[in-house]
A protein has these predicted regions:
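ABC ATPase NBD coupling module
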Residues: 64-84, 112, 124-127, 220-226
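Conserved ABC transporter NBD signature motif
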Residues: 56-64, 76, 108-110, 117
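A short, proline-enriched helix->beta-strand linker immediately N-terminal to the Walker B motif
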Residues: 148-152
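Helix-to-loop junction immediately C-terminal to a conserved catalytic motif
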Residues: 48
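Conserved ABC ATPase signature
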Residues: 129-133, 137
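The feature captures the beta-strand-to-loop junction immediately N-terminal to the Walker
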Residues: 33-35
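Catalytic Walker B motif of ABC-type/P-loop ATPase nucleotide-binding domains
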Residues: 154-158
Length: 234
């Protein structure tokens, strides 16, 4: 599904990613865990095409997309939900969804029904402005917008930030359901140990722009590993 080899990226003259290698199989959920400033968001931005790599390659379903623009990656099955809620706050929930329908040229009535089946929380909110939604509701809307295009690979950047625990549990259930119903592949970056352990089949630790270790979800609670690689231990 996704093959990343020797990926490097920089902001100006400051290198951020230092040769990342990662292979993700179809239907796999892979987590990337690490401190702020270690390159998690930069890695996702480089994968989706918002930041041009300075070295290495990215392949999606056997196709080299290293130089492909972000919008084409989106149309070729790669979805991205950035940190901080990717919605239009001045528009209603329904109009936010309609933008995604138009972008992906899908039938509104059919896809809206499918969206509300997966995200029932949005049904009574369709006429509300995005700005009045809670942080959790905004995140669910951002996720729903992204999935309107039926991506095969979904990139999630810290989706639990600032969200109440009940909606975090709801998002976990939604994503687990999509794994079964759509065989969705996910690359998830997070600092929430419980969230990443609940969803990921394997977890990579990122440190100073490199993937330095791979662990199973049940190893995340090893205090020595957490302190050594992430600094989140007690």
């Amino acid at each position: 599904m996704l093959a990343v080899a020797g990926l490097k990226a920089a902001y100006g003259r400051i290198p951020i990613l230092h040769g990342i290698d990662l292979n993700v199989a179809e239907g796999e959920f892979v987590g990337i865990l690490g401190h702020n400033g270690m390159g998690k968001t930069t890695f996702l931005k480089t994968l989706i095409g918002l930041l041009r790599p300075t070295g290495g390659s990215i392949e999606l379903n056997g196709k080299n997309i290293t130089r492909m623009p972000a919008y084409k990656r989106n149309l070729n099955g790669m979805g991205y939900v950035p940190q901080g809620r990717d919605i239009f706050p001045n528009l209603t929930v329904l109009d936010n969804l309609r933008i995604a329908f138009a972008m992906h040229k899908v039938e509104e009535e059919k896809v809206l029904e499918e969206v509300l089946e997966v995200f029932p929380r949005l049904k009574p909110l369709l006429e509300r402005s995005g700005r009045v939604l809670s942080g959790g509701e905004q995140q669910i809307l951002a996720l729903a917008r992204c999935l309107c295009g039926s991506p095969s690979l979904l990139l999630l950047d810290e989706p639990t930030e600032g969200i109440q625990p009940s909606i975090i549990e709801e998002i976990i259930e939604i994503l687990q359901g999509l794994r079964t119903s759509r065989n969705l592949t996910i690359v998830l970056v997070e600092q929430n140990l419980d969230f990443i352990a609940s969803l990921s089949q394997r977890v990579h630790i990122i440190q100073r722009g490199q993937l330095v270790n791979e662990v199973s979800p049940d190893q995340l609670y090893n205090p020595e590993l957490v302190r050594e690689f992430v600094g989140m231990g007690g």
